[in-house]
Structure formats: structure tokens, C-alpha cells
């Protein structure tokens, strides 16, 4: 993957805004606990546009970052990117995970006009620690402008309350990967939860094998279309215990 190291070290507090935003399709910045990706994986689905991402601050296990973009024209129903902060962690089988505490506080702004995006966690599992994606578990904190998840039927298969938040659960395929999407029934901009509870629900009720390894944990935004849009994550933290 093309990218750069943004001079982030394991200091108690370190501001890296001076490192500047990065705008390349696969650019990223790494700290001890996180990798922050620009990840413009589907930019060619837009008629025009660009996106840049930057890290603002690191304090212990908490990171602050932002991403700004304009995506116009083309396939308005397709995601263009997934700028995100990915946790660096040791892969574990779901049955051996005790907790996945996480917090995320963010704000979103955009110019007038059509704006479609989601804010979501994205978890992937596999039957081996080094295997390819078999299950994808998304947790949508926000669905702006009519954004919708992958679904075989277009309808939720369940309504689930986890912690103090209610979610509609959708299921569908993405190639050979089975995708579960928990979509919050109302926008959450200040989120605190144990993500293990989402995995536990799926293993008990939706057939997710507890022998699967959690191999990826990310949180970010999927834009479909928008002008002068910016997501600012004032704080994000996560751990797999």
C-alpha cells in the first residue's frame, strides 16, 4: 500500500497537524495504536472530486483526526471512499474476546445541496488470523441523506437494543463476504460502547461462528456524494481485550 509515516510516536501527547493532510488514494499515517487511512477505494465512481485526511492529535490511546471531501456526479448511489482510523491489535477468536471498549465523538459539516454519507465502524472476521474477509460487521452511527446498507431484501431482519442505543439490523452479501449492518435508529455523534456485545448478539442469534477471528476494526465515514464536506473526529479510542 502506498503511503507515508507521519512522524507519530508513542508519546503521552503529540500534535501532528504540522505533518499536513494527505490526499493520495492510498495514503495513510501511523501511530502506535492506529493507522489513519485516506482510502479512496472507489473514487472512479465519481465524475469529479477529491478527499484529504489528517491527524490532529494523539493523547495516549485516543486519537483525533479529520477528513474533507467533495464528490460529485457519477454513481451517486455508490460509496466513494472510507477514510478511517484502524486499530492496531492482535487478532483474536471471537470466543476469546472479553471486551472491545470504544468511544467516538465527531461532528459533520457540508455545503448546501445533495449530501449522502454514513459514519460507521467496520469490523472484519475470518476463519484464520491471517485469512481473507468472511464476515463484515458494520455499526452505523449515522446515515445522512438516505444512505443505506448492503441488504438482500432492503428490509431490516431485526431491531436490536445494545447498551442505550437502538439499531436496525440488515444482512446481505458483498461478493463472498456476509455483511451484517447495525444501523442506528437515530444519529449518534457521541458513542461509547462495548463492541463485543454486537459480536455476541450475532453469534447467539444470527449464526456468526464464535470461532471466527476478528482481524480488522476501523471507524470512519463512507461518502456517496457531497460538496465541501468535513468529518471531524475530536476523539476516538478502541481496544480488543
UniProtKB/Swiss-Prot annotation:
The xyloglucanase activity is inhibited by the binding of the host apoplastic glucanase inhibitor GIP1. Keywords: Carbohydrate metabolism, Glycoprotein, Glycosidase, Hydrolase, Polysaccharide degradation, Secreted, Signal, Virulence. Changing residue 222 to D: Abolishes xyloglucan-degrading endoglucanase activity, but does not affect elicitor activity. Residues 1-19 form the signal peptide. One of its GO terms (molecular function) is cellulase activity. Its EC number is 3.2.1.151. Glycans are attached at residues 174, 190. It catalyses: xyloglucan + H2O = xyloglucan oligosaccharides. Pfam families: Glyco_hydro_12. The active site is at 136, 222. Transmembrane segments: none annotated. Disruption phenotype: Severely reduces virulence. One of its GO terms (cellular component) is host cellular component. It is found in: Secreted; Host. It comes from the Eukaryota. Belongs to the glycosyl hydrolase 12 (cellulase H) family. This is Xyloglucan-specific endo-beta-1,4-glucanase 1. It comes from Phytophthora sojae (strain P6497).
Amino acid at each position: 500500500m502506498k503511503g507515508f509515516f507521519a512522524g507519530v510516536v508513542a508519546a503521552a501527547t503529540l500534535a501532528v497537524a504540522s505533518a499536513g493532510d494527505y490526499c493520495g488514494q492510498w495514503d495513510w499515517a501511523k501511530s502506535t495504536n492506529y493507522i489513519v487511512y485516506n482510502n479512496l477505494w472507489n473514487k472512479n465512481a465519481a465524475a469529479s472530486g477529491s478527499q484529504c485526511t489528517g491527524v490532529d492529535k494523539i493523547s495516549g490511546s485516543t486519537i483525533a483526526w479529520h477528513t474533507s471531501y467533495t464528490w460529485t456526479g457519477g454513481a451517486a448511489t455508490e460509496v466513494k471512499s472510507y477514510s478511517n482510523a484502524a486499530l492496531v491489535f492482535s487478532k483474536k477468536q471471537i470466543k476469546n474476546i472479553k471486551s472491545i471498549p470504544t468511544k467516538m465523538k465527531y461532528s459533520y459539516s457540508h455545503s448546501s445541496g445533495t449530501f449522502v454519507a454514513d459514519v460507521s465502524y467496520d469490523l472484519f472476521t475470518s476463519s484464520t488470523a491471517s485469512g481473507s474477509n468472511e464476515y463484515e460487521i458494520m455499526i452505523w452511527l449515522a446515515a445522512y441523506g438516505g444512505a443505506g446498507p448492503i441488504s438482500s431484501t432492503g428490509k431490516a431482519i431485526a431491531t436490536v437494543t445494545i447498551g442505550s442505543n437502538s439499531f436496525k439490523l440488515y444482512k446481505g452479501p458483498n461478493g463472498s463476504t456476509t455483511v451484517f449492518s447495525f444501523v442506528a435508529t437515530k444519529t449518534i455523534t457521541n458513542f461509547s460502547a462495548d463492541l463485543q456485545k454486537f459480536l455476541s448478539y450475532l453469534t447467539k442469534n444470527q449464526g456468526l461462528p464464535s470461532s471466527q477471528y476478528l482481524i480488522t476494526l476501523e471507524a470512519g465515514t463512507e461518502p456517496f456524494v457531497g460538496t465541501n464536506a468535513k468529518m471531524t473526529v475530536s476523539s476516538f479510542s478502541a481496544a480488543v481485550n
